[in-house]
Amino acid sequence: MTWRVLVHNDAINSFAAVAYALVRVLSMPVEHAAAAARQAYESGVAEIGAYTEREPAEAITARLQAFGLNASIEVAA
């Protein structure tokens, strides 16, 4: 089973705030964080990562939520 970590667009966080949180929480390169933030903004959701264990996906989701992002996990189809 694969668990996907998702970031959703919302009316609260700016594009820059989403990218900043992704860099801080995941040590994601700035270019990748900006691309993910743009995807969330344009399509409403961006997949941030996929994990074979549920616990790491939950931990990352919680850290993103602590930054104020609208993040969730789902089982990959």
Task: Please annotate each region the language model reported.
Residues M1-A77:
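Terminal domain-initiation and capping elements
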